[in-house]
Amino acid sequence: MGGVFLLLSKISFYGTTLILIVLILVLSLKFNKKTENKIIEEVSNEYMASYFDGEYQTEIPGKNDGYVVDKIVCDNGAVGEWDNEEWGINIRNATQKIKCSVYFKKALTILGKVIEDESQIATNDPDNNIRYVGAEPNNYVYFNCSNYSNQNDSTCEKWRIIGEFNNITKADGTKENLTKIIRNDSLGNFSWDYKQNGVGTSISTYGSNDWTDSQLMMMLNTTDYLKSGYTIENSVVKDSNSQAIYQNMGSYYNGASGCKPASITSGSSFSCTSIDFTSTGLQNDLTRNAIESVVWNLGGANEYNSSVNGLASHWYGYERGITIYSGHATTWIGKIGLMYPSDYGYATSGSSMQNRTLCLSKELYNWNSIADCYNNDYLYNSNLNQWTLTSSSTSAYNIMNVYALGNVLSTFSYYSNYSVRPTLYLKSSISISKGDGSSSNPYQLKLN
């Protein structure tokens, strides 16, 4: 007989029912194919069948082989529960001859960590990306640490893992699956852009919604990502006509003093309103080198106020499309961006009253009327109006926002009372070393 051994661990009575709990330890397996296309191993009065992704196999996967148990089906009233630590099965109510089938499936992982509670994730966006969902999923991660050898609330910031995204195009043109994270707390309130008519890409008094030369982009990113044709003279950023646009580009990225996005008119000099990022900006090169430079999609939206054009799935398509205001860029290469409207929409878990499917069938424009959708979304904050990266394609200056009321609307890019939550992709070489992702025990990263 093949080597499956039952180690008796407990026998006890509850009422008149005998509860027999046994642990099956798999040392080696020699299965026999049955007529019902199952693989069965008999040991005494117990039988066990093994399936990987719905197909029977001749062995059970090892603990570190990248599989998790999908379900266990036992007959004759027995109940099987999988012990992930011991990598074995606990069987209850084994009062007679039983057969248990154990179904394994490929584990979902983020940063090398197997997601054991799959109720906290979803994979149903158009590209089957793995996303965390819910009001408070275990997706906290320490990042931007002053000391990665001693990661805690004092040495690190808390960020949230949005998810793992498939086939992200990197700056060198290659594609990888990369993990996107967002700062848990707002960096502060800033204008998205406040360039006036004739300055850079602006053609209005309300700023420009072209991210490639927005003042917010310049505040967050290093000079490596300055728009082609633009120059820097004595720390002043100038457009292709040598008009001043901004000053001290990259202050957040470099953890230095810089300037807030501010009004600048054609023919005038930029007047810096100082902002100090020495404590809230990126702290060191370990952090900076952990961020992947990628292609960010800048597609915009036209109509989005109904269920035929404003669902999270529609936004996902708009963001990756080429519909933008005339002359504006459809993509941008850089490190620090913002969340998308679709990130917000897909992060909901819904509730027992209004489940996720129903939330995703409702336009984000009207989510303010569905508390079960936005209250069960960790990207929502009732105290913040949050900038996104996505623009209006019919306007040269409107940007989409996640409002404190829970819906997604557009507003002028020059407004200064909207919150910024830096968002970025981690390099694929980075993994989780410890932690459980809760707010009290965030994941800790191993930076290579």
Region locations from a protein language model:
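Short, Lys/Arg-enriched N-terminal segments with co-localized hydrophobic residues
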Residues: 1-6
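Long, domain-scale functional regions
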Residues: 11-73, 77-448
